[in-house]
Amino acid sequence: MSKRESSKYKIDRRMGENIWGRPKSPVNRREYGPGQHGQRRKSKLSDFGVQLRAKQKLKGYYGDIREKQFRAIFAEASRRKGDTPENLVGLLESRLDAIVYRAKFVPTVFAARQFVNHGHVKVNGVRVNIGSYRCKPGDVIEVKESSKQLVTVLEAVQLAERDVPDYIEADHNKMVATFVRVPALADVPYPVIMEPHLVVEFYSR
């Protein structure tokens, strides 16, 4: 198991949930957390604990976003008009690494970030190497011609595990995707229940 995979599964174990719906997740085989004390019965969480866990799960899902960056995303979501939890999810799903993941160009959000950071992706014909780059509706995301060989190796895994949501149009033959619209929370295909309203409560304390 690679270091990246180990980190990903560590998040699953910490949350006690298979947050990406991966068949190989260790929580599919056990219902306790990591470490020698993981088998102890879990105590009931306080309101703060529930809110913290919701925040950790959401930011973990998007590749364990650093706290400073996640807080900045939340701050922007709260400044925008409309429902803050919906705004938060919309901003997270507008990230370039999230779109590359949703489009099935790579098997995990961790791989998506690395793929973008290594310069394999273009947005509207321009190479972008920042995973947190925010895409707008209508943006065209494509894998560089010289990088398409890297993607096809993972094709069987990608296509077997999840569908492309309807707010993204993807052509897997050309390795091109269009970000159609910013999704609502109900549109996002999370394998587990996400509770962004609890994230709002956490930061509003």
From Swiss-Prot:
Amino acid composition bias (Basic and acidic residues), ranges on this chain: 1-16
Pfam family, one: S4
Region (Disordered) residue spans: 1-46
GO cellular component labels: small ribosomal subunit
Gene Ontology BP annotations: ribosomal small subunit biogenesis; translation
GO molecular function, one term: structural constituent of ribosome
Disulfide bond residue pairs: none
InterPro entries tied to this protein: Ribosomal_uS4 (IPR022801), Ribosomal_uS4_bac-type (IPR005709), Ribosomal_uS4_CS (IPR018079), Ribosomal_uS4_N (IPR001912), S4_RNA-bd (IPR002942), S4_RNA-bd_sf (IPR036986)
Entry-linked SUPFAM superfamilies: Alpha-L RNA-binding motif
Source superkingdom: Bacteria
S4 RNA-binding domain mapped to chain residues: 94-157
Ribosomal protein among keywords: yes
Keywords, in A-Z order: Ribonucleoprotein, Ribosomal protein, RNA-binding, rRNA-binding
Keyword Ribosomal protein recorded: yes
Quaternary state and interactors: Part of the 30S ribosomal subunit. Contacts protein S5. The interaction surface between S4 and S5 is involved in control of translational fidelity.
Assigned protein family: Belongs to the universal ribosomal protein uS4 family.
Task performed by this protein: One of the primary rRNA binding proteins, it binds directly to 16S rRNA where it nucleates assembly of the body of the 30S subunit.
Descriptive protein name: Small ribosomal subunit protein uS4
Organism: Sinorhizobium medicae (strain WSM419)
